[in-house]
Structures are given as C-alpha cells and as structure tokens.
C-alpha cells in the first residue's frame, strides 16, 4: 500500500541513477521534485553481476543514504517498475525519510534483493549516478567503487 501525496500522486524515494534530473524527466513525465532527504539506517551498495551492477540501499544501522523525494503519478510508477525490473531484480516497499525541514514522510523505495552479490558497476552507470549526485549538489566521489 503506497501513501499518496496531497495531489493524489505517490512519493517516490530515489537514489542512484534516479537522482539524475535529465533521466527522471525522460522516464517519469509527471514527476515533480519535492525535497532532498535522508534515509536513515541504510547504506549504498553496488549489487548485481560484473558489468551489470546497480546501486541499492542496504540496511545498516547508524548509517544513512542521501535521497531525493519525487511526487510521481501512477504512470510514473509503472515506468519505474519497468526500469527497476520490479519484482525480479528489485523489491518495492514503503519507507520513511527525513526531509530537509526535519519532517518525516513515507514513500515507496526500490531495494535490490540481497541474493545478488556486491559487484563493480560499469563506468557508464557510475557516471549516470554521479551526475545525479551533482544534480542534487552533493559530492559524487562517495559513489566510487
């Protein structure tokens, strides 16, 4: 059950390549940026297979992941499900995040199944993720493998 925004859409918690504003504009036509936020008790990990590894947010007490919150439509959610290869590669569930204004909201997030090993991503994928970090005004070097 996904929580809906005031406009009737859903809140999507994004990290990785979905921080990239240009890609999100192409992927999710109705998406609107809401806020930067922190996903508490998670850490970023690359998982997958050699040359096909992607970022995921793994549980890790005491750590946090910088994320963006997007207001997305039902059509955007369908597009994201396809992009994230849900439910085969990633699971999707509700999670709480701490917004910049210290409010907490709940949105949906994708997390890769931990059956996939930690693995080095392709340079092109890493660059797309780094562009997203730069788009948000963050230091992209944290994404180096």
Residue ranges and their predicted role:
Residues 6-145:
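Glycine-aromatic micro-motifs
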């Amino acid at each position: 059950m996904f929580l809906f925004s005031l406009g009737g859409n859903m809140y999507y918690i994004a990290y990785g390549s979905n921080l990239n504003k240009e890609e999100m504009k192409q992927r999710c036509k109705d998406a609107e940026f809401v806020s930067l936020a922190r996903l508490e008790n998670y850490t970023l990990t690359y998982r997958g297979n050699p040359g096909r590894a992607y970022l995921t947010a793994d549980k890790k007490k005491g750590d946090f992941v910088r994320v963006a919150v997007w207001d997305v439509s039902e059509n955007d959610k369908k597009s994201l499900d396809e992009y994230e290869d849900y439910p085969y590669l990633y699971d999707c569930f509700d999670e709480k995040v701490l917004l910049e204004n210290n409010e907490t909201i709940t949105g949906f997030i994708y997390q890769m199944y931990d059956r996939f090993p930690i693995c080095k991503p392709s340079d092109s994928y890493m660059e797309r993720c780094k562009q997203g970090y730069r788009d948000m005004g963050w230091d992209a070097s944290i994404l180096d493998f």
